[in-house]
Regions:
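Short acidic, glycine/proline-rich loop/turn micro-motifs
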Residues: 214-219, 256
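Active-site-proximal N-terminal segment of extracellular/periplasmic enzymes that hydrolyze or transfer
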Residues: 2-54
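Metal-dependent active-site segment of extracytoplasmic phospho-/sulfohydrolases and closely related
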Residues: 23, 45, 224-264
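His/Asp/Glu-rich, glycine-adjacent segments
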Residues: 76-216, 275
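Short, structured active-site-proximal loop/turn typified by the sulfatase FGly-forming signature C/S-X-P-X-R
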Residues: 35-79, 121-123
């Protein structure tokens, strides 16, 4: 199929990439994680990207959760346009809290789907399955040009639903624990194999923020994670690719140096002047 020179998604124009365009979303990657790891010599490949490429601090969308920001990356638009306004939604019709991982909540096409419609080969791997359906909306898996699966359910994939049969077996790696750094490593390893075998035009890799919730930038668990990522980044750079590394949101400690909760307390006066609530 002859590829068009550009595609339009949500009133924005994107050129068809001349080499595989890879977007990597490091979930919860506060910039300090990178600064510390680079300062300690743990991320030479990312350091080179910073020095020879473009390095910017970006604002996340509000609310600064995983689902809204991943979909803003995927659509190029804020939640007011794409409709994914949180990780969860209160459904007034049922009175229940619903996870916003269903395509029915998505109001705008993804950039990935527009490139796919234009004839591009599209691949994506997410750590958790909750994002996969949203990010892969509009892709078809019966033409051999799309693969989308999660590390979490890699052993449940099929050609009909994901473009690959049993991704865990295909990759030669067991499905990791959900709450582990290995879940994200599975994503990176899959990206390498997809570049080798599928040769996509567009690829999106999205991790989990288990490590970022568990470790501060100065702790060894975080340093090990970013050193691991940098090794895979070096492997990706051996291909003819253009790489963007970004995050969906940052991460801040919940406690101060004295182990006290880092929260802001406000006194709200309600109808009775002698009563007040702390939040």
């Amino acid at each position: 199929m002859t590829l068009v020179p550009h595609v339009i998604a949500n009133e924005r124009t994107y050129p068809m990439p001349k080499r595989c365009a890879i977007a990597i979303c490091l979930d919860g990657c506060e910039p300090e994680y990178l600064d510390v790891a680079i300062a300690e010599g743990l991320m030479p490949n990312l350091q080179m990207m910073r020095e020879t490429g473009t390095d910017r601090i970006a604002h996340s969308v509000i609310p600064s959760f995983t689902n809204p920001n991943n979909l803003s990356i995927a659509t190029g638009r804020p939640p007011a346009v794409h409709g994914i306004c949180g990780n969860y939604l209160f459904d007034p019709d049922t009175g229940e809290e619903v996870m916003m991982n269903d395509v029915r909540f998505l109001r705008a096409p993804t950039v990935f789907s527009r490139f796919y419609e234009a004839g591009a080969r599209v691949a994506m791997v997410t750590a958790k399955d909750k994002l996969r359906a949203l990010l892969s909306a509009g892709l078809k898996f019966d033409e051999g040009r799309a693969i989308a699966f999660s590390a979490e359910r890699a052993d449940e994939t099929s050609v009909a639903n994901n473009g690959v049969e049993n991704a865990s077996e295909w990759l030669g790696m067991p499905v990791p624990e959900v709450y582990s750094a290995e879940l994200s490593e599975f994503v990176f390893a899959a990206g390498i194999k997809l570049l080798t075998e599928m040769k996509p035009d567009i690829m999106y890799l999205s991790t989990t923020d288990y490590v970022q919730h568990k470790f501060s930038p100065q702790e060894q668990g975080a340093k090990d994670f970013y050193a691991m990522f940098d090794r895979y980044l070096g492997e990706l750079q051996k291909f003819d690719v253009a790489i963007v590394v970004t995050a969906d949101h940052g991460m801040k400690p919940k406690h101060d140096d004295n182990k006290k909760p880092a929260v802001i307390l406000s006194l709200i006066h309600i109808s009775e002047p002698t009563r007040q609530a702390e939040i």
